Design a protein with these regions (language model features):
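Beta-propeller folds
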Residues: 1-340, 346-349
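Serine-hydrolase catalytic core recognition
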Residues: 121, 144-145, 200, 211, ...
């Protein structure tokens, strides 16, 4: 019955994964499917499914992070006090695998930018035979250290985080190979000076394989590792003049044949099959198909599963058999829906989750070979609110847009408009979903028309569309919102363009503030949540990917900074930000507030005490949306 206690490292890892729940947030099935591995308050437990017997693992002091089953299911591994450990389940005894890890130089944990920007959440990997662990060593020496304290409890010591700002020192990462039985590690060799980012590691159905990137992220290498010597062989080089997008699902090895690889060199996302030496064998998913996510591959039937489609607001589940044409997998999902899927270990079944603008997420087990679908029962409550949303594409192959009108909409009446924005890389706002539109429908019901659109720089279009924002976050992202808003109003004359407000969070917080600062003739007020204000204060891997290294591209940082536009600002902005945000630090809001205050510009700061980049507290979330509605009623 005691409250859960998490260390700063555990909290940060959950934050990177965008996990707001607490308690048993995940579980892992053993390789034979008979046991569950769960973590709670830094301790590990194994649950026998048949008997429901629970065993607490005999781990030493400190929190156990990133637990995993060994390939044979006889051991459990984890990171504790900066090193990798295993517990032998036969006698419930702990053994240290790596040695010498410290806070500054830990073993087995992914560094901040790997977790936040590369979607790589682990820092160690088992060999298929369970004899060796490949582990990351991260040297934070010389990096900047940011501190976050709880302003409500100044007596509590501040948490400290290594944080790499653009143009400054990054963590130095290397990969070691350690036999579980002991001995000295073997260090993997590659040109880390030219390729400092260890982006992807995989060790399944093929050799230990790495993807490493140069700092500019315009070039990456696929490397095969000899585990006996640590020497590497280059299998493939991927280059892009703007940047190379990472996908953690590739390289995906097909044992004895080669590996699948994702590229955009032909104008849009494409999936290739390459041989063991990296030579191109065939294109399995062509650019015109609209590849979204790779689900998995079943070598027995030579079947690749993926989601995608030509409409970026939706996707469907497809399969390609032995390099043939893609065809739809029969699922319960309607045509205009958003689908995610997981392939079973034996490749025979898929767990398919789908949602639409009228349906909350539902899950079914699908066995394509038998054309069998079995719904998974749900105990989720059905919302009482139904979004009244219209989704369409603007003319001339323009942005996709969505409009939500009030429930009591009166034809002929003019309504103030709220432009809900994100507009940045790797995220779409206009989607065929219900849950994410519930709060926006509530906002519309307060007497607004809510509009959103996905302009240039957003994903699931062409390479040129996404990379149009290179070296400039401000011009096209804001310009597309303004021009798109005007185009939508031509379809919906009830929109009162003399009363437009902008709301967004994170990059959307940046864009909403930018619209009020730079386009005050159109956007009359903004509600800006957790905005990046000066991109020189965000992290290296994200920012340098799009804007370049500051010394080489100072103009990109100047034109993209909100501070540049403060002197000419004419519209009010409300800034809301968690004081414990370890992604977009609270300093961003303080910087903008300081500049606006000294320039005599109207603004309000609403700090969320000791909250991070997410707002998981239901009461705070409720008050947040009430404040959004109140703010726009006051200012529009």
């Amino acid at each position: 019955g005691a409250a859960e206690r998490l260390t700063a490292a555990e909290k940060a890892r959950l934050e990177r994964q965008r996990v707001s729940a607490r308690g048993f947030t995940s579980y892992q099935l053993s390789p034979d499917g008979k046991r569950l591995l769960v973590a709670l308050s830094g301790k590990l437990y194994v649950v026998e499914r048949a008997s429901e017997q629970v065993t607490q693992l005999a781990t030493g002091p400190g929190a156990c992070i990133d637990p995993k089953w060994s390939p044979d299911g006889a051991r459990v591994s984890y990171v504790r006090e900066h090193d990798v450990f295993v517990v032998d389940l036969a006698n419930n005894s702990e053994r240290r695998v790596t040695r010498g890890g410290t806070e500054v130089r830990p073993h087995g944990l992914a560094e901040f930018v790997a977790q936040e920007e590369m979607s790589r959440f682990t820092g160690y990997w088992w060999s298929p035979d369970g004899q060796v662990v490949a582990f990351q060593e991260t040297d934070h020496s010389g990096m900047e250290v940011f501190s976050i304290n709880d302003p409500m409890h100044p007596e509590v010591q501040a948490d400290r985080f290594f944080y790499p700002r653009p143009g400054r020192k990054n963590a130095v990462v290397r990969l070691g190979l350690q036999r579980v039985s002991g001995g000295a590690p073997t260090w993997v060799q590659w040109d880390a000076a030219a390729y400092p980012y260890l982006a992807t590691v995989t060790w399944k159905d093929g050799p230990l394989t790495l993807v490493v990137q140069n700092r500019e992220q315009t070039k990456e290498l696929v490397l095969a590792v000899d585990p006996k010597t640590g020497k590497t062989t280059a299998l493939h080089v991927e280059e892009d003049a703007a940047w190379v997008n990472l996908d953690q699902s590739v390289p995906l090895w097909w044992k004895g044949v080669g590996f699948f690889w994702r590229t955009e060199r032909n104008g849009a996302a494409e999936l290739e099959l390459r041989g063991p030496d990296g030579k191109l064998l065939a294109s399995w998913v062509k650019p015109e198909v609209g590849l979204d996510k790779i689900v998995g591959f079943d070598p027995a039937s030579k079947t690749l599963y993926f989601t995608g489609g030509s409409n970026p607001t939706a996707n469907r589940l497809f399969r390609v058999v032995d390099g043939g044409a893609p065809d739809l997998v029969e699922t319960p999902a309607p045509e205009l829906s958003l689908t995610t899927a997981t392939l079973s270990g034996d490749g025979k079944a898929l767990a398919v989750t789908y949602t639409s603008t009228s349906d909350m997420p539902a899950t079914a087990v699908v066995i394509p070979s038998l054309r069998l679908t079995r719904p998974v029962p749900s105990v989720a409550l059905e919302p009482t609110l139904q979004p009244e949303i219209s989704i369409f594409q603007l003319e001339n192959d323009g942005p996709w847009a969505a409009v939500l009108r009030p429930r009591d909409f009166t034809k002929g009446k003019k309504y103030p408009v709220i432009l809900n924005v994100y507009g940045g890389p790797h995220h779409l706002e206009v989607l065929q979903v219900r849950r994410e539109n519930l709060a926006l429908q509530w906002l519309a019901n307060q007497g607004f028309i809510v509009v959103k659109l996905d302009g240039r720089g957003t994903p699931r279009r062409t390479r040129a569309w996404e990379r149009a924002i290179k070296h400039d976050f401000a011009t096209l992202t804001a310009g597309d919102q303004v021009e798109g808003l005007k185009a939508i109003a031509r379809r919906y004359p009830e929109m009162d363009l003399s009363r437009v407000g902008a709301y967004g969070w994170s990059f959307g917080g940046y864009l909403s503030a930018l619209l009020a600062l730079k386009h005050g003739d159109v956007v009359k007020s903004a509600f800006s949540g957790a905005p990046v204000v000066d991109w020189l204060d965000y992290d290296t891997h994200y920012t340098e990917r799009y804007l370049g290294v500051p010394d080489a591209h100072p103009k990109a940082y100047e034109v993209s900074s909100l501070l540049t536009y403060v002197p000419d600002a004419k519209r009010p902005i409300l800034l809301m930000h968690g004081t414990a945000d370890d992604n977009v630090y609270f300093l961003h809001t303080l910087k903008l507030s300081d500049a606006m205050f000294k320039a005599g510009k109207r603004h309000v700061v609403l700090p969320l005490t000791n909250l991070t980049h997410m707002v998981p507290d239901p009461l705070v979330m409720e008050r947040q949306w009430e404040r959004i509605a109140t703010w726009f009623k006051e200012t529009l």
